[in-house]
Structures are given as C-alpha cells and as structure tokens.
Swiss-Prot record:
GO terms classed as biological process: regulation of DNA-templated transcription
Protein origin, superkingdom: Bacteria
Lineage of the organism: Bacteria, Bacillati, Actinomycetota, Actinomycetes, Mycobacteriales
NCBIfam families membership: rrf2_super (TIGR00738)
Protein name per Swiss-Prot or TrEMBL: Putative HTH-type transcriptional regulator Rv1287
Any further remark recorded for this protein: Was identified as a high-confidence drug target.
InterPro entries reported for this sequence: TR_Rrf2-type_CS (IPR030489), Tscrpt_reg_Rrf2 (IPR000944), WH-like_DNA-bd_sf (IPR036388), WH_DNA-bd_sf (IPR036390)
Pfam families listed in its UniProt record: Rrf2
Entry keyword set: DNA-binding
Cellular component terms (Gene Ontology): cytosol
GO molecular function terms listed in the Swiss-Prot or TrEMBL record: DNA binding; DNA-binding transcription factor activity
UniProt-listed Gene3D superfamilies: Winged helix-like DNA-binding domain superfamily/Winged helix DNA-binding domain
HTH rrf2-type domain sequence ranges: 2-132
Keyword Coiled coil among UniProt keywords: no
C-alpha cells in the first residue's frame, strides 16, 4: 500500500486532534506546528476532512478545528478514504473487473485478501487507539511480528545472507 503525503498528514492531524480535550478547538497553525505539516497544505486537508464531516470548523479569532465525533468513533480507514479514496485498488479497476485468466486468475483472490487484511487493521484502529498508544490486540501483534521479521532480516543481511 502506498499512502500519499496528504493522507499521512491527515492521519497525523486527526490523531493530534484526538488528543485535545472534548470541546477544545485547535488552531490550524498550532496543529501544523505540532505535527510539522506545512500550514497551507493542512488547510486543504482540513477542508476535505470537514466536507466528509470528520472535523468541525469554528470561525473567528478563537476558531479552529475539532473532531466531529469522539476519536473512538473515527477509524484510520475513515481518514484515508476521505483523502485518498478506496483503501486498496489495482490500477483503479474493481477487483471483479481485472482481466486475469489462466494461471493468473487466483491473483484476484490475493488482492482481495490484501484488501481484507488492510481493511481489518485500518477500520478497527481508531484515532483514540493511536493517540492513547493502545492499539487493538491483533494490530499490535501484527506490528510486533513485522518488527521481528525486520530484525531477523536486517540481522541476516549484516551477516552476509
């Protein structure tokens, strides 16, 4: 999965907003500074998030943004779909419409499994989970497994493998 910078910034901004006390409005410049996001780029991102009703904006001198719902009710998938569209696609073609035949026919099921796996992680992980550092158990286990594989892989490559 390749995530655009815009989507990654959006997730970071939303997690940052999830750390604000309920009813607290965060100014765009403060949000940009907290996450190192270019302010003008963040304005565009927040506009998309507002259009999809993931954030609420407040005008005026004391204005800013807040989550439209509690962080426990907004998944990482919600944010990514708002910014980048579907979670996984192959050349922007529906999986049922891929022109696979013969020995490549089963690839459609590989892409389905990939999409289901990503969807499971991204839909079940909320902004509050990330902000609180307490990921769902299966997500934390997948992350631990990945770190172990990386450690093994990098250790093996250092020893000439």
């Amino acid at each position: 999965m390749r995530m655009s910078a815009k989507a990654e910034y959006a997730v970071r901004a939303m997690v940052q907003l999830a750390t604000a006390a309920s009813g607290t409005v965060v100014k765009t410049d403060d949000l940009a500074a907290a996450q190192g996001i270019p302010p003008q780029f963040l304005v565009d991102i927040l506009t998309n998030l507002r259009t999809d009703r993931l954030v609420r904006s407040h005008r005026g001198r004391e204005g800013g943004y807040e989550l439209a719902r509690p962080g426990t009710e907004i998944s990482i998938a919600d944010v990514l779909r708002c910014i980048d569209g579907p979670l996984a696609s192959v050349r922007d073609i529906g999986l049922g419409d891929l022109p696979y035949s013969g020995p490549t026919t089963a690839l459609t099921d590989v892409w389905r499994a990939l999409r289901a796996s990503m969807r499971s992680v991204l839909e079940e992980t909320t902004l509050a989970d990330v902000a609180g550092g307490a990921l769902p158990e299966h997500v934390a286990q997948l992350a631990d497994d990945y770190r172990a594989q990386e450690s093994t892989r990098h250790g093996a490559s250092r020893h000439g493998d």
